[in-house]
Amino acid sequence: MGLFDKIFGSYSDREVKRITPIVDKIDSLGPEMEKLSDEELKQKTFEFKDRYAKGESLDDMLPEAFAVCREASTRVLGMKHYREQLIGGTVLHQGRIAEMKTGEGKTLVATLPVYLNAIAGKGVHVITVNDYLATRDKEWMGQLYEFLGLTTGVIVHGLTNDQRREAYNADITYGTNNEFGFDYLRDNMVIYKEERVQRPLHYCIVDEVDSILIDEARTPLIISGAGSKSTDLYKIADFFVKKLREEEDYTIDEKAHAAMLTDKGVAEAEKAFGIENYADANNMELQHHITQALKANYVMKRDKDYMVKDDEIAIVDEFTGRLMEGRRYSDGLHQAIEAKEGVKVQRESKTLATITFQNYFRMYTKLAGMTGTALTEETEFREIYGLDVVVIPTHRPVQREDHSDLVFKTAKGKYDAIVEEIIETHKTGQPVLVGTTSIEKSEYLSSLLKKKGVPHKVLNARYHEQEAEIVSHAGELGNITIATNMAGRGTDIKLGEGVLEVGGLKIIGTERHESRRIDNQLRGRSGRQGDKGHSRFYISLEDDLMRIFGSEKLQSVVDRLGLEETEAIESKMVTKSIENAQKKVEGNNFDIRKTLLGYDDVMNKQREVIYKQRSQVLEGENLEDSVQAMIEDVVTSAVQAHLGNIDEDDFEKELGDLIKYLEDIMLPHGKFTVEELKTSSNEEITRKFIECAREIYKEKEEFVGSEQMREIERVIILRVVDTKWMDHIDDMDHLKQGIGLRAYKQQDPTQAYQMEGSAMFDEMINNIKIDTVRYLFHVKVEAEKPQRERVAKETGASHGGDSQEVKKKPVKKEPKVGRNDLCPCGSGKKYKSCCGREVV
């Protein structure tokens, strides 16, 4: 704590002081609320809604609404909010992060701002880390909301669209970040507005906010369809890298989590694949496959980064140890790991829609979060999300003793000492929770305990199903639980009978995590609600953190002391050195996330433009003027491209090419000739082409009817936009993969990505116009009463958020035309190259 904080109190102290008068006001309303009958208490909700509709702000209603919620909670749940919980609720309503220690009742705290903000009638979302917690909290707290006249819903995996829509239309909706994010993406892929399930994003409270907004920030949500590329090259690249020798043919950079070929390795690749220059742009695909094969074989570790389960590769969440079901590494890394492990290599998928959690959650009008550990990441929360962190005081003083770290020379010495400590503690009956950083290490420690005949339970990704059950018993007398990192987070560890008498729950950390926050979370499992407890971390100089980021100074101290394998040192200097190593890694990880956000912000602005225009089309905006403007733009830009600034000698050739080009898109074959137009000015040519195209379009509309034509325009525009957007996502991804090399040319990669990405976006918009006009002029429909289903079918449009791409072909009510026959439209081209071409 700095001198300023000692004199004036910390930022959180000052904020809590500021909120105290509001809490006093809530307290003073208590007796008044106690006098109300159940029905009168419920009527308060409708009174608040009426006052809100008349212009009273939620801030003004806060003391009264919180007092109503507090009284209802006492009656329905038998739980009355403490003053500290009222402070936490106020912080959450203000759109901030409330740091509340484990066991301080975060679930109950959230009911206050959730109730108040639900009064606005715009929907409140409560985000949890898994389906189990979402369902539990909805059922538990739903009793309170329903008593107060509000509706609740829960979004879990496997619901139908109608069930999802119903849940989102409730006043309060619980669910996981994945479900909310995927629903947003799917809503922006539908053909009919009635198929959307979400309402506009209004107010959101994220439980375990650090886990979702920071730990998962680097993992984008992706909806994908099957790709078409062969998987053979992954197997060939894997076969090649398995023969390479470390240091000689490749090197590993543990800090960057990457592996690279040496000059000798490059020569080996050129020889093996029969190429002259490995670095040549033509060999980019090969470079990519070899790079991913190197990373898969020599950087990614089985049972730490991923597991092989049912002949498939399952990603292990590095922070929780849980399996990330349904998630795959992007950029071909997943396929490279599949090749390494000898399981079936799945085809690389095509991205249909994608968004990062960073950008999804920044779309809410108001965002708030709660967690036991946020202060260490305060800078990131403020810079990325505009959220500040307020530490809420605990209801009872923390009595847990956090002991200094013990540092050993070797990992073996460390594990021997841990086993010894567990055995000694077990004799007293004190329960022990041991935190490890990987499945591999938890199982290694388990094997050591088995050899000594010590009974214990192991909790990691392999036993995900029993997670909550095992964790809930971890505080019972004599229990020993080994857990991978934060597995079981969200489930309280309550102390069993007689445990306080033997010192409460003992926490043993088997090594320091890269992030201090994860260490604090482990410590926080003990000492809830003022209970006694103990915690200590055991560290060796062979641990990843110490080996990669630890200081040489610490190593030299250990060497000078001449420590034996079983001896440990314990000092403030050592702890400081370890914290500095962690700060270094945290800073490094923050920079990576910030850089990725810089790239994603470019895509985000483009996504917003596309989704906004898409929404306007869905909402029924009259598209007639837009289509006419597209026709004009396509003709004008084509004339400019062919006839602008050219030599007189080339004029007739370019004019002929222009006519052919526009005949392919919209003009009737043979209507215009070079002879007829060669004396006309560019402006005159443009005018004639536009007039002709408009005339043809008008005739088409008169034939099918205006209402049917507007519907056809809507479906075709949506599908062309979707197709081009999907291709653009791929193109931007490829651009990002190679953009890092710009640094060698003294260019800022982010700036280069922004400029080139912007040019690619403009090109995509232009191509959308061209394809939309082409399909509108080529589509053949019969005149009859418009039917949305039929129009969608005829233009090849699919319903809903289908993750597979849809092939669209114009429907013709004529005898079937062979793909190699001349096209009946009169263009002179083969049917497959003209009206029979596929839209996607």
UniProtKB/Swiss-Prot annotation:
Binding site for Zn(2+): C823, C825, C834, C835
SMART domains (alphabetical): SecA_DEAD, SecA_PP_bind
Keyword Cytoplasm annotated: yes
Cofactor note: May bind 1 zinc ion per subunit.
Highest taxon of the lineage: Bacteria
Descriptive protein name: Protein translocase subunit SecA
Catalytic activities: ATP + H2O + cellular proteinSide 1 = ADP + phosphate + cellular proteinSide 2
Ligand binding (ATP): Q85, G103, E104, G105, K106, T107, D492
Disordered: annotated span: 787-822
Keywords from the UniProt entry: ATP-binding, Cell membrane, Cytoplasm, Membrane, Metal-binding, Nucleotide-binding, Protein transport, Translocase, Translocation, Transport, Zinc
Topological type in the membrane: Peripheral membrane protein
Subcellular location: Cell membrane; Cytoplasm
GO molecular function, one term: metal ion binding
Cofactor(s) listed: Zn(2+)
